[in-house]
């Protein structure tokens, strides 16, 4: 089942978070950054890819300073519907706390010329552990990279 880990961690009768829905239409790929006041304040970077939001928790948040490297821990995929989520996840639920949209927009691979080539290059980068992308957001803009720090681990670095 797609989004199995996401679904297993949530009690949808007790949280306002969205359930996974049907597929989505093709076009430009979206990104969203959530500011999440959970047990510890952090930011969640979510990139639309393969019909879901690939997600990383970024404890110190993204930076526009190229000299800074930010830890980014890959977490479970989220449903595409999560792109619009803001609200309070009630106490006792996974990820309880306040969630707001901090930034959103579109993103693409820096060398892609078509939508098909874009997703292909992004997927290749994700699988290789070196994902390069250009954000076109309200706050974040320019070229970024997510670089995996081990061969199969969940720890990545977010670089500008």
Predicted feature residues:
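A charge-rich, low-complexity, intrinsically flexible signal that marks solvent-exposed coils, linkers
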Residues: 1-160
